[in-house]
């Protein structure tokens, strides 16, 4: 409460912090530093998966929600409750805690959609798709979810700065109709000539962004493959797509590979990740964030945000003034969530690591933080009901 009062009294100004230590009965003073207090509030919760930074095997993992107004962390679902299976790709509709989805793999496999307390289990593999549905992105209306379908493989380097290569042999993009349990797509999104992945809707729901690269033989061409950032019109009333593809990032011209597009809720900015090649940037030390101003068409390299190590996954706050991203800047191994302010003019502040109550928390932790997502409130779910449906519920098959 004292901290909250101090912040409220300092909105629009700065807090000056002085540090003193007593060593050998003598007091020492460090140079003071300032903290700028912004009037734009941050969403109160952050959701992430915590998992050891392994490659093929896992044991413990879970999805957790952390209150950013204090240090309270609560379990959404821990895999010790579901026979130590894999769970991933949690996603929210417009930062709403009442409409979300996530996948479970291996045991109790399926996609789980939670809507206002209702839980639905889906079997998303169809004869027309490469795989079960993978990387998700909600339509702002909540009626649709865009997904990629991927034939993903993994290889290891004998000697390379990047330990692992994750790549697709094939991939497509589809749109799932939540109400009708149907999948729709278009030739530009599911072609044999290209590999499409990482979909994201515009804030008005009228455009679908995605990444695409010419199909090639993998893994032989893993260092040559580079993804363009593209978009196509989408009509939510007719469930139809446009005929023209717009290219926002041309990989051949730029010489790098784009992935993970995310549009700010106000529609002003599009953030994405670039690396020298490929589409799985979490293992690429050269991966950085980029920010496209949709109003001016200018791209910011975000030099004050990026580091010499991995910057990869990112997501927006509901007011478009904050973003959170995954980074391995601390030790090159563990992925941790960094939070950054973005002014209305597109100028970012200084990123800071998600605060913890114990100052040595990250030094002692043996877990990485995956897929950090802001939400506007606490997820309210009957965990026992979710586990029961996970283990014994019959999955709805898609059409």
Which residues does each predicted region cover?
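Sequence signature of WD/YWTD-type beta-propeller architectures
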Residues: 1-399
